[in-house]
Amino acid sequence: MVWKRTISAKALEKAKSAAVKVDDKVIFIANVNGNLYAMDAVCSHARCILGKLDEEKLTVRCYCHLALFDLRTGQMLEPPYVAPDAPKEKLGLKTYQIRDNNGWIEVDV
């Protein structure tokens, strides 16, 4: 395990979500009602950065072609509108362990 510091817990609590650079990766992190989540922030379809967090459904939508991902598992729930027959089971995103360590959000990469 290699825990990497990202942003302050206060900043994430205020923003609710953020795309952060960790080494050579961009990771989407979120704080939903005190629960922390982390997954790849680059859509597996066209390499766009994910953006729209739905706190109620725990999903994240890609801004480019509207693919929808489960924040907990990284599974693609809805394919991009430009590729409705895309194999959802093959286009999921990697999730990461995440923690609050003394006021800093850390991701295990």
From Swiss-Prot:
Pfam families: Rieske. Belongs to the SDX family. Its main location: cytoplasm. It comes from the Archaea. InterPro entries: Rieske_2Fe-2S, Rieske_2Fe-2S_sf, SDX-like. Its cofactor is [2Fe-2S] cluster. Not yet known. Binds 1 [2Fe-2S] cluster per subunit. Residues 3-107 form the Rieske domain. Homooligomeric. It comes from Sulfurisphaera tokodaii (strain DSM 16993 / JCM 10545 / NBRC 100140 / 7). It is found in: Cytoplasm. GO terms for cellular component: cytoplasm. [2Fe-2S] cluster binds at residues 43, 45, 62, 65. The lineage of its organism: Archaea, Thermoproteota, Thermoprotei, Sulfolobales, Sulfolobaceae. The keyword Mitochondrion does not apply. This is Sulredoxin. Keywords: 2Fe-2S, Cytoplasm, Electron transport, Iron, Iron-sulfur, Metal-binding, Oxidoreductase, Transport. GO terms for molecular function: 2 iron, 2 sulfur cluster binding; metal ion binding; oxidoreductase activity.
